UniProtKB/Swiss-Prot annotation:
Belongs to the phosphoglycerate kinase family. InterPro entries: Phosphoglycerate_kinase, Phosphoglycerate_kinase_N, Phosphoglycerate_kinase_sf. The lineage of its organism: Archaea, Methanobacteriati, Methanobacteriota, Methanomada group, Methanopyri. GO terms for biological process: gluconeogenesis; glycolytic process. This is Phosphoglycerate kinase. One of its GO terms (cellular component) is cytosol. Its EC number is 2.7.2.3. It is found in: Cytoplasm. The keyword Zinc-finger does not apply. It catalyses: (2R)-3-phosphoglycerate + ATP = (2R)-3-phospho-glyceroyl phosphate + ADP. The gene is pgk. GO terms for molecular function: ADP binding; ATP binding; phosphoglycerate kinase activity.
Amino acid sequence: MYENISTMDDFEFENKWVLLRIDINSTVIDGKIEDDERIKRHLGTIKELMEHDARVAILAHQGRPGEDDFTTLEPHAEIMSEELDNFEYVPDVFGPTAKKKIRSLEPGEVILLENVRFYSEERINRDPEWHARRHLVRNLAPLFDIFVNDAFAAAHRSNASLVGFTRRLPSCVGRVMEREIEVLETMVRDEMEDGVFVIGGSKIEDAIKVIRRAIEMDNVRRVLLGGLVGNLFLWASGVDLGKPSRKFLDMKGYTGYLDEARELLEEGDDVILVPEDVALNRGGEREEVDVDELPADAPVFDIGTGTIERYRKEVESAGMVVANGPMGVYEEPGFEKGTYEVLNAIADSEAFSVIGGGHIIAAAKACGAYDSIDHVSTGGGAMLRMLAGERLPAIDAILTCPFSGC
């Protein structure tokens, strides 16, 4: 799919102004970054550019408007400054302060610009040509020689900072993106047998697309569901979760996916597994019940022990396991069991294993499974969509870049 993508090996960076897009979107609680995995992953690309005497300005985002984690990039800059010399944080995206700093960059220097999602048009999904005419690209592109996109975790989006510069500058992928493409394309191309997808978390839209694709794939044997995804599909299967869980799904706007979930359960009834028992949060205590004992007046916070054992057996006999999203609210004491035990089953299995997404990576570190996973992807939604055979707009934009060297 992406065999001919341009990489950093195709360019000379000495004394060039390089605009680097990375994805350091992280879990932020009370202004503090809880896991710096994504930040650390991009250091290799940044240091390589510095070693080649490039003048580097970095674009990145954090959170979404209206969410608690929609913050400045100052906490990220603090972590990066501990690892990088000649590094500076600039609290501006493309205003006079940012432009002045960019123009004054010396070879081997790096600046991190402000959260690009502070700019409203960044959040619009449009084609590269449309974004190339917007303020962000028109203001920044003339200041640079090369655009490097290393933001694999956001590659399934078609935002201005991800696709627009490919119509104004010679462009390539960075080292993180290159490695992700290499590993995931190999998995798709080789069609590893006895595939098992473990889908949890709360990204319902992404999950629906991947589940639809997975049940069509001959090499995917099972799709195991947990988290809010599992709760939604349980509801769609006819299980009354109880008012607290129904209310939460409705508040998040996920009830609109119930009909699609019902369709998928009918089409993939021999592939999709939903929880057979769950753990309720009753006043902070874990209470396990079979799904036929629902509805409950307490919210569902995890999969139950029976489901864990069932999922463990599926994972143990798999040839390939792909996991995205936790099985429950693993951050809450007592409700990490499903996520941790399924992750440890994946780590202990003989299957080629891939996990992706910020929450499941943090959970894998916490339970000791991280080092036994074959490939830890920086992307959640991007990873799942690529494995499902979907094209990723940010990578396609580089493939169709009209400049020499792209």
